[in-house]
Each structure stands twice: as structure tokens, then as C-alpha cells.
UniProtKB/Swiss-Prot annotation:
Matching InterPro entries: Aminotrans_V_dom (IPR000192), GcvPB (IPR023012), GDC-P_C (IPR049316), GDC_P (IPR020581), PyrdxlP-dep_Trfase (IPR015424), PyrdxlP-dep_Trfase_major (IPR015421), PyrdxlP-dep_Trfase_small (IPR015422)
Post-translational modification N6-(pyridoxal phosphate)lysine, affected residues: 267
Taxonomy of the source species: Bacteria, Pseudomonadati, Aquificota, Aquificia, Aquificales
Top-level taxon of origin: Bacteria
The protein's name in its UniProt record: Probable glycine dehydrogenase (decarboxylating) subunit 2
Subunit note: The glycine cleavage system is composed of four proteins: P, T, L and H. In this organism, the P 'protein' is a heterodimer of two subunits.
Family: Belongs to the GcvP family. C-terminal subunit subfamily.
Chemical reaction(s) catalysed: N(6)-[(R)-lipoyl]-L-lysyl-[glycine-cleavage complex H protein] + glycine + H(+) = N(6)-[(R)-S(8)-aminomethyldihydrolipoyl]-L-lysyl-[glycine-cleavage complex H protein] + CO2
A single MF term (Gene Ontology): pyridoxal phosphate binding
Keywords (A to Z) from UniProt: Oxidoreductase, Pyridoxal phosphate
GO cellular component: cytosol; glycine cleavage complex
Amino acid sequence: MELIFEKSKKGRKGYKLPELDVEEVNIKEYLPEEYLREELDFPEVSELDVVRHYTNLSHLNYAVDTTMVPLGSCTMKYNPRINEELVNKKEFLNVHPLTPEEYIQPLLKLVYELKELLKELGGFAEVSLQPAAGAHGELLGLLLIHAYHQDRGNKEKKVVLIPDSAHGTNPASAAICGFDIKVVKSDKKGELDFEDFIKKLDERVAALMITNPNTLGIFERKIKEIAEELHKRDALLYMDGANFNALVGRFKPGEWGVDVMHFNLHKTFSTPHGGGGPGAGPVGVSERLKPYLPVPQIEYDGKKYYLNWNIEKSVGKILAFHGHFLVWLKALAYILTYGKDIKKVSEYAVLNARYLKHLLKGVFKDPYPESPCMHEFVLSATNLTKYGVRASDVAKRILDYGFYAPTMYFPLIVREALMIEPTETENPDTLKKFALILRKIVKEAKEKPEILKKAPHRTPVRRIKEAEANRNLILKFKDIKE
């Protein structure tokens, strides 16, 4: 398929500007030449060319609208279209973030309602909606932990414990906040090794970051005991909320002793992934961390809703304005639509994952056969390496059959990992079809491994030389032509 640049023809236009209704000036008379911008080298195409080009491109995409996207730890569920219609109403789109509070009381009410619902669902004392994404929420959570220890004079607490199965953002966020990292091993059941945790839990530990269910899709059964041991030493428990889709409506992390957790609205509450944003990663906290929340907090005094800037020990502001309002609205609509039945989200997410894992029994190696999965599971393709086939080959071959691939090679503690999360929005027929395709691919691996090693065969872009592509980045169309 041609690139949009290859469709360009000099002089072809897709727009017409209105006639100038003010006096024309020569900008060169007012600005020195070094400040003048050069004309951008945009492709010259008609409007119809653009519409056809991007419509055709969209038909080549793998997306939730066209197929199942079983990316583990991503929760690629269906995003209700009515929510998009809702947030595109001019009453929401045209509100400036500096509009005085008295003119936006209904909107502040909606935001306050979302905050209260997240507090209830998470079992927390308070929630900040401000973070712009999950990793941003992580950063805020660690800033709150840092502020807590500084306030209490715990200058020695500079270590954050992180499981070896953790998301990569966990150690990155902790390091950005100035903490040292110590890794805690997983045990043979795929849970945090409690003995190793206790051994590394000394007076220097500020917090433990844990995901529950963890990235293996396994529930951390000792979560309450972990919280108790941390609190005995005035250390805190951070829970990564990436996998909250397995818990929502059934469990409240705050009741386990979790001190801080970020919610991924794009996962659990169906605000869309991708497109570079905007996202939202609200953070729920226990009473311990409530005094340090960022400003402003949205409050209600019984008569009006307002932005509270008067939080004495606040870590300050972490976003230019107040947060991503339209994303909040989508999450609020999603929660209100389910109401008290929101627990069905987690029930069906877990049911679908367990059913799909059952359908794939014996197809790949199960690294933790004794542990039931929650909303996702990890299998290992090490049983195919003797045929010269790796997990990445399996993933690329899946594309030929119309499904997107699972997450590969994560978590790092499982060799040749395939991390699969079907979400609650897929039906049993889709799961059966996906399982049949994987069985067929494994049969191909054993009988005709070259098919997998050269896959994909039916996608617009075939197999790329990944190592070469990483070393020799081509980021511009002109570089391709040269």
C-alpha cells in the first residue's frame, strides 16, 4: 500500500482558505530571517485521497472493533461507543479549565461523583483524579510515600521492594522518586516469596510495590499478611492497579491494608487505549497518605462543589490543569451503567480467562500448574523450541489467522512467555476459535516450523528484521526514499 507521501502531486489541494479580510503584511519586514519557519513538507493530496487512504489503513488494523486483542496485562476490552457520543457533546467539549467554579457546578458534581465511586470500589479514604495515566499515577503514589516518610522523619527509608514479576514501570517510577530498588523473588506457585520478602524487609524499606493479581495472573493470597508486616515497620504497601479488572466489585484493596493504588481507567473502566492519550490514572490512598494528596482536590461542603487548594502538606500540583475531564466522564458512565452489577465485570473476566486456559490445556507448557488464574494467564512456548520455534514466531503466526497476538516475553521470569488476557467482553465462540487456531499453529510448529519462522504471511507488512530495525532507525519518509 502506498504511503500518503507517495500519493502527493504538486499543486493538488484538499483545502481552500477564505479570502484575507485584513491588511496583508510581509512577515519578513517584522521578523529576522532566522526566526522564520520553513514551509512544512506536507503531502499535496485532495480530501478524497486523504479519506480513502486512512479508511483503507483502518481496514488493515488489528483493533478491538475488528478482532480479539488478547494482550496480557492490557485489558483490551470493548469501549462502549455511547461513551464517545456522550463526551463529544458541546456542553462538555467547550468548557475551559479556568472557568469559575460557580459556572460549572453540574460538571464538578459529576467529577466528585466519580471520585466517590472510586473510593468505594477501592476501599480508600480519598482519591486524586489528577494523574494523566497509570505510570503517572505510580509516580504520584511514590511521591506520596516519600512525603509521608519525610514528614515522619524516616530519613533512612530509601528502599522500595519490588517483585521479580512486576511491571517495568514499577522500578522506573521508584527510581525517578529517588528510591533504591530491591527485588523480591516469586515462589514455585507464582506468588511473592514470603520468606524472601521478610528477609529483605528491614528498617530501610519505605514500601513494597505489588500487583494483585500479579502479572502471572495469580492472586497474591498473603496480601493482608504482607500489609501487616510492612506496617509493623512503618513501611507502606503500594498496589499497582493494572489488574483491578479481576477484582472490581468483589474486593476492595483498601480493606487488605493497601495504602496507595492507581486505577487504570483505560483498562478496568473502558476509556480507550491508544492514540497517545489522553489517559487517566487516579490514585486511591489510605488515611496515612491523605494529607499529602496533590492540589486541587474536588470537594463538596453540603451546598456547593469546589476546588480545594488548601492542603497544607500536599505534594503540590502534578498536572498543568486539573486532569482529563472527558476521560473521567467515560469512566463514570461505565460505572453507572453497571451499577451494583459491576462485579459481573470481574466475574466474567476471570471466567473467560479460566475457560480459555482450559481450552489450551496441553498446548503449551504451564509454568504454574498448581495456581488457578484470575483474569489472565501466562503459558510458555518452551515446548516448541526443539523445533526451532519461539514465542515470537507463534505470536506472528497468530496475525495470519485474524487475531492479534498475546503479550510476549513478559513477565521476564517465564521463558518464552505468552501472556493472554481475553477480558470479559469476549464470547465463548471467540475463545473457542482462538484456542483452535493456537492448536493448529502448534501442529504447524511440529510439522512445518518454517511456516512460523517466516510468519506473518498475510499482513501488509511482513516479518521485519527486528535487531537491524532497532539499530538503524528510519523515522522519516525521505530516509526510506534515500
